[in-house]
């Protein structure tokens, strides 16, 4: 499996802001937006392109555009924070959705939403989720995509844990990984260590809010 760890000073600085427990929701979202755009940029490096003539104010120049823009598929909830940076880089991309919640006792994914094209064959797919922990949610999502014919799947995660990376490697599923960091372990609650906490809560606040 192809794994790209994006080693860049700006990537590292935004990831540091996201890790910092002092970063409030607004600061975390801003750093996530910047980092998301950088990871999408890197993930797009090998996308197929086509060339055409374009007229400048002076002469004709060779233009370039994506041959087939990828479909962006966030894993809800935390993956929603990566849609805007993805679309800022690839504005003509389509967006699909996979909704998965985590069972806090078993740490297994619980599906609740699936909004995807029926046929994903010959279609690049960018599967976005800020965190790859156990790999359960990501593997479930990849299987859903593969069932629809997807063979060109790139998982884009801000922070990955080594156990989740190993699970992805051993799955045999058609996927490559682009990430800003691979952290060494998970704690007993299946949180990435050192990680950055609960990405969904840090983006949007706690799931259950008493009014």
Swiss-Prot record:
One of its GO terms (biological process) is UMP salvage. It catalyses: UMP + diphosphate = 5-phospho-alpha-D-ribose 1-diphosphate + uracil. Catalyzes the conversion of uracil and 5-phospho-alpha-D-ribose 1-diphosphate (PRPP) to UMP and diphosphate. This is Uracil phosphoribosyltransferase. Belongs to the UPRTase family. Pathway: Pyrimidine metabolism; UMP biosynthesis via salvage pathway; UMP from uracil: step 1/1. Transmembrane segments: none annotated. Its EC number is 2.4.2.9. Its cofactor is Mg(2+). Binds 1 Mg(2+) ion per subunit. The magnesium is bound as Mg-PRPP. The keyword Glycosyltransferase applies. The keyword Transferase applies.
């Amino acid at each position: 499996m192809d794994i790209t760890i994006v080693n860049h000073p700006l990537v590292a600085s935004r990831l540091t802001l996201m890790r910092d427990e002092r970063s409030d929701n607004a600061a975390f979202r801003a750093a996530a937006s910047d980092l998301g755009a950088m990871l999408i940029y890197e993930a797009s490096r090998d996308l197929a392109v086509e060339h055409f003539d374009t007229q400048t104010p002076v002469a004709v120049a060779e233009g370039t555009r994506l041959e087939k823009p990828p479909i962006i598929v966030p894993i809800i909830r935390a993956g929603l924070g990566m849609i805007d940076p993805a679309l800022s880089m690839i504005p003509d991309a389509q967006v699909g959705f996979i909704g998965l919640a985590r069972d806090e006792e078993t740490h297994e994914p619980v599906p609740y939403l699936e909004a995807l094209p029926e046929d994903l064959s010959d279609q690049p797919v960018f599967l976005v989720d800020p965190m790859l922990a156990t790999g359960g949610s990501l593997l479930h999502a990849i299987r859903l995509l593969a069932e629809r014919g997807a063979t060109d799947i790139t998982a884009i995660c801000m922070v990955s844990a080594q156990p989740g990376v190993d699970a992805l490697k051993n799955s045999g599923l058609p996927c490559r990984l682009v990430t800003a960091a691979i952290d060494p372990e998970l704690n007993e609650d299946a949180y990435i260590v050192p990680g950055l906490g609960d990405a969904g809560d840090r983006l949007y606040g706690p799931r259950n809010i008493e009014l």
